[in-house]
Regions:
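Structural and coupling elements of P-loop NTPases
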Residues: 1-197
């Protein structure tokens, strides 16, 4: 989940996280925190690396001291949730050892693929703050189409699952059609199997 428009008036990342958790449960966990809000929005704190990224292009730095305790608190909740995905990580965590960045990243990815954690990120698309981190998170933590169960088609009495394959018959879903005065009619679709030549 990407909480956008952090540079706008009335932007409140923590209220959004609280509402997400009350609606969908505690599995909606921040993996980033905003630095400031409204006109003072400056950047993002990455809870995996515990680094701050401010401005555009993002400059890596240390977490501001005023947000250090809050970042550590949110990171502790994230690490605890990630550790629960694997017995060896639970043992390491309960033994008081720090999880490495690789273990934390891999564990988060497995938890997201399993549906046990929904990562919550923040940023401002208009100011291009947090967007590169959003794209990195999509590549690092979200499942590829081959790792997900493919859509089921047909009625409930005769369901059929689709496996991703270029050799299979085409199955696609049109999700948007628009008209552009210069290009003409544009149709956006998601290909579930097959190929379009």
């Amino acid at each position: 989940i990407f909480v956008n428009k952090m540079d706008r008036e009335n932007a409140d990342f923590y209220k959004v996280v609280e509402e997400l958790q009350s609606k969908f449960g505690a599995k909606c966990l921040p993996v980033q925190l905003p630095i400031g809000a409204h006109n003072d929005f400056q950047g993002i704190i990455d809870l995996i690396t515990m680094k701050s990224y401010t401005g555009f292009p993002p400059e890596e730095g240390e977490i501001p001291s005023s947000l250090q305790a809050q970042a550590e608190s949110f990171r502790e909740k994230l690490v605890e949730a990630v550790a629960e995905i694997d017995d060896s990580l639970v043992e390491k965590y309960l033994g008081g050892e720090e999880l490495s960045l690789e273990e934390l990243g891999d564990g988060l990815r497995r938890a997201v693929v399993a549906g046990r954690i929904v990562p919550v990120l923040a940023g401002s698309a208009l100011q291009n703050i947090g967007i590169s981190l959003l794209l990195d998170a999509i590549c690092s933590y979200l499942p590829s189409p081959k790792e997900r169960n493919i859509a089921v088609i047909g009625d409930s009495d005769n369901p059929e699952t689709l496996e991703p394959s270029q050799d299979a018959p085409l199955a696609a879903l049109v999700f948007k059609t628009s008209a552009d005065p210069y290009v003409g009619k544009l149709t956006y679709f998601r290909v579930y199997q097959g190929a379009i030549d």
